[in-house]
Amino acid sequence: MLPSTGRHRRTRTLSIAAAVACAAGAGGVYLGLSTGGAQAASAAVTVSTTAQLEAAVKNATAGTVIQVRGGTYYPAATLKSTANGTSSAPITLRAHGAEKVRIDGSKLPAGSWLAGIYGDHWTVQDLAFVNSPAQGFVATSSVGGVFRNLITADNGDSGFTLRGDGTTGNLVQNLDSHGNYDPAGHGQNADGIAVKFGSGTGNRITGARLYNNSDDGVDLWQFSSPVTIEHSWAFGNGENRWNDAAFEGNGNGFKLGGGGASVAHVVNNNAAWDNTLHGFTENSNTGALALNRNTAYANAQSGFYFATGTARLGKNLAVGDKGGAAKLGSSTVSAGNNWDSGIATPPFRSTDATTAYGARRADGSLPATTFLTTGSTTIGSTMD
């Protein structure tokens, strides 16, 4: 117990009615309890204007829940926060109920990100980040983030980015990232999702659709800790859809390294098709990458390119890739793949990708499809 100061400390209580009145100017209702200022108040706010959204993100603290009403919002500056939530009181930014929310960067200054989070334990879900002059959504050195059911589309650089040292324990679930293109770099930088220039364990990408981006679907350039990627699709990346005469987009589905990092990323049950370079590539990563039950189809170069490292490939399926099923180095371990001796290639139920572009299921997971499915329980992606 702290020694008495000789003064009687008076606890101040704010009535619910007063709290509502105070919060009205910020466009929402905040309800919280505080004990003499010793404990941070939890807060809930519903916003319906761009100014309210900007203020709510700027002023968020642990436990804040920001619910955004349906509509399109045009920030005048990057939505930015350095605030930290906690594992028990995350900061939440989400759509209100099932309402559709677009956060549009078309009024931002040149070179601006649309959203930038520099704190820990954020949950961001059910929002679209579109038309940024640069990156759509960036989380820097974040811990324990949950980024769910997001759309990052038609931005001027990568749609979704995790970066920085200390990027730890983040979940990216059910992301749709498409149409991102960087005109300043002639398409060589804009990926669907980039986890790059950093480190930190426990980061996972699941249920993503990464398509029609100018560079790669996934890019893990210079990220020095293992990332897990599962149940995700990368397709149509690297094609010059912007009539750029000096276009330089790469066009890998899953680029799993580069820049000197040697990392054992884990890549399970994914699919890559119609990319302008490789379906899956080490991209000079010499680490013990593990790839199991992935499918590559109709990519312009190799389905699987692992020519220099120590990757372990098992039960993968490659069909119709113009540069061949796989290009492997002497240190690559390959077993149970359809290019290995004695392994049959099961037929696809469908090669019509139309349903892969369809609406996601009610829980946000990938759409049901027979595209590239085989019914096999031993080889290739299950496409779900």
Predicted regions and their residues:
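Right-handed parallel beta-helix/beta-spiral solenoid domain characteristic of secreted/periplasmic
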Residues: 46-48, 70-76, 83-134, 181
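Acidic, glycine- and Ser/Thr-rich low-complexity intrinsically disordered tracts
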Residues: 43, 193, 309-384
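Post-signal peptide N-terminal regions of Sec-secreted extracellular proteins
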Residues: 41-44, 58, 84, 118, ...
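Acidic Gly/Asp/Thr-rich repetitive segments characteristic of extracellular carbohydrate-active
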Residues: 41-79
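C-terminal region of N-terminal signal peptides and the immediate post-cleavage residues
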Residues: 6-8, 26-44
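Right-handed parallel beta-helix
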Residues: 90, 96-99, 120-131, 143-156, ...
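Extracellular beta-strand/beta-solenoid scaffold signature
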Residues: 78-81, 105-115, 131-138, 154-164, ...
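N-terminal export and membrane-targeting signals
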Residues: 2-20
